[in-house]
């Protein structure tokens, strides 16, 4: 995944020092794009170990429309703990917007169900979009959506996905986001009878926190290894029917984990 290493090098070489909401400080660049061909291997970073369990369970949690961390905690995933209230609630974050966007007329819009149906019915549509950025509810969210809009595209029997991420924690968050949306693209492709195409990751404010700079430099000393292969249970034909057991990652041989603190 040289695309990711190129981004690290760009930020370390060109990044502007900026203040941020957390008070940590960042090096930041604005506007960056990475492309991953999903038939070339599953884009799971190999220059440090990533937690597949957390990536898959978070995605399944989003698709459930859930916004309470109980499901995650029950499966040993703690990545949202810092933002939850005393009841485990996060407000109307990703899952709520994906599955039950509140319309002005009182309806609840299931964007995921709608986009899957539209891909099947009208694959050439330029409206194959899901957004989590709901200005009317931002203030109610524990954390406004960082990966805020994605669009599908069908050509030559393949499904591609482009994600726009307004705010990108490049050391901790971005590797996670790449794997998550690559997997989502594969899942949607399967249930719509298509093959996976590309995952395209477009970043707005792409930043390294000041307490992640040494870790990023360490990671750049490591040589990327061959990408693993993700297989999905072919019997699942409903986007909401996937379980953790339906995913198997083969030949994942990463370098060791690199510890870094989350900026809250």
UniProtKB/Swiss-Prot annotation:
Active-site residues, Swiss-Prot/TrEMBL: 146 (nucleophile)
An annotated GO BP: dTMP biosynthetic process
GO MF annotation terms: thymidylate synthase activity
This enzyme's EC code(s): 2.1.1.45
PROSITE patterns reported in the protein's UniProt record: THYMIDYLATE_SYNTHASE (PS00091)
Assembly and interaction partners: Homodimer.
Purpose of the protein: Catalyzes the reductive methylation of 2'-deoxyuridine-5'-monophosphate (dUMP) to 2'-deoxythymidine-5'-monophosphate (dTMP) while utilizing 5,10-methylenetetrahydrofolate (mTHF) as the methyl donor and reductant in the reaction, yielding dihydrofolate (DHF) as a by-product. This enzymatic reaction provides an intracellular de novo source of dTMP, an essential precursor for DNA biosynthesis.
Protein name from the UniProt record: Thymidylate synthase
UniProt source species: Rhodopseudomonas palustris (strain BisB18)
Gene symbol of the encoding locus: thyA
């Amino acid at each position: 995944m040289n695309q990711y290493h190129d981004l690290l090098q760009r930020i370390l070489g060109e990044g502007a020092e900026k203040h941020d909401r957390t008070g940590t400080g960042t090096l930041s660049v604005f506007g960056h794009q990475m492309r991953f061909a999903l038939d070339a291997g599953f884009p799971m970073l190999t220059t440090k170990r990533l937690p597949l369990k957390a990536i898959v369970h978070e995605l399944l949690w989003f698709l459930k429309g859930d916004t309470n961390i109980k499901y995650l905690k029950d499966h040993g995933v703690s990545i949202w703990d810092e933002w939850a209230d005393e009841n485990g609630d996060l407000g109307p974050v990703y899952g709520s917007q994906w599955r039950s966007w509140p319309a002005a007329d009182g309806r609840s819009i299931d964007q995921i169900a709608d986009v899957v149906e539209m891909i099947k019915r009208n694959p050439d549509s330029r409206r194959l979009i899901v957004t989590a950025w709901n200005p009317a509810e931002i203030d109610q969210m524990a954390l406004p959506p960082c990966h805020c809009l994605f669009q599908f595209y069908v050509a030559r029997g393949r499904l591609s996905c482009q994600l726009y991420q307004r705010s990108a924690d490049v050391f901790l968050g971005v590797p996670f986001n790449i794997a998550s949306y690559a997997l989502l693209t594969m899942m949607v492709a399967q249930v719509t009878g298509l093959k996976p195409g590309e995952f395209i990751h477009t970043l707005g404010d792409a930043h390294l926190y000041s307490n992640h700079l040494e870790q990023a430099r360490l990671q750049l000393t490591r040589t990327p290894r061959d990408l693993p292969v993700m297989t999905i249970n072919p019997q699942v034909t409903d986007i909401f029917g996937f379980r953790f057991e339906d995913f198997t990652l083969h030949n994942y041989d990463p370098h060791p984990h690199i510890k870094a603190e989350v900026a809250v």
